[in-house]
């Protein structure tokens, strides 16, 4: 999961290209331990973003993403075209992605708590009563992008607060994916 900045302010970016400035990863090991990785930078951080993402992601295994075609996969392909030297590694990452939204989008799983929607925020309450976006300072991607757009205009203390709020929101997204994934596994076990 990462949030994006829609105005292309840097060299080698086209109109309406998106600047990836933040990501959050939760990596689950085979023994069930969960480790969180976070990246956040301002300015032109594309190269460092790519390098850190490649370093933080395990070299093998499935990468679960939610609604990946219009966001994560598209952005990585865009970065691969801007930085050819990373194309092979970014293409490899894309090839390991699996879209966690598909069972919900296809109607293979439905719960009335979803209220006819299948966004991550709509399905999280189905699988957890305790984890919620409602307590966060930033509760959606648009607010995260707006906060980022004003980031460089802030003083150092405000920057820390904005960075923490954006990072916490994005961390919630990837943790929610973890909860939903394990919730689906339990549903299959209990209803098989």
Language-model segment annotations:
Residues 9-10, 76-78, 182:
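Short amphipathic alpha-helical segments
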Residues 19-21, 57-60, 171:
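Short, well-ordered loop/turn elements at secondary-structure boundaries
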Residues 123-192:
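Acidic, Mg2+-coordinating catalytic module of metal-dependent nucleases/exonucleases
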Residues 27-29, 35-142:
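Conserved DEDDh/DEDDy metal-dependent 3′-5′ exonuclease domain
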Residues 1-49:
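Metal-dependent catalytic core segments for phosphate chemistry
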């Amino acid at each position: 999961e990462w949030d994006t900045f829609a105005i292309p302010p840097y060299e080698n970016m086209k109109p309406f290209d998106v600047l990836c400035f933040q990501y959050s990863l939760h990596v689950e090991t085979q023994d069930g331990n969960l480790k969180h990785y976070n990246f956040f930078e301002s300015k032109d951080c594309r190269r460092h973003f790519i390098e850190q993402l490649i370093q933080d992601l395990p070299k093998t295994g499935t990468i679960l993403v939610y609604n990946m075609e219009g966001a994560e996969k598209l952005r990585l392909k865009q970065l691969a075209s801007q930085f050819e030297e990373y194309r092979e590694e970014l293409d490899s990452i894309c090839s390991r992605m699996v879209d966690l939204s598909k069972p919900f989008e296809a109607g293979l799983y439905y719960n009335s708590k979803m209220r006819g929607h299948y966004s991550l925020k709509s399905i999280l309450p189905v699988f957890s009563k305790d984890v919620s976006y409602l307590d966060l300072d930033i509760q959606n991607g648009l607010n995260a992008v707006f906060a980022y757009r004003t980031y460089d205009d802030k003083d150092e203390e405000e920057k820390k607060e904005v960075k923490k709020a954006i990072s916490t929101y994005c961390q919630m997204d990837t943790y929610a994916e973890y909860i939903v994934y394990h919730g689906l596994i339990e549903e299959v076990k209990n209803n098989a």
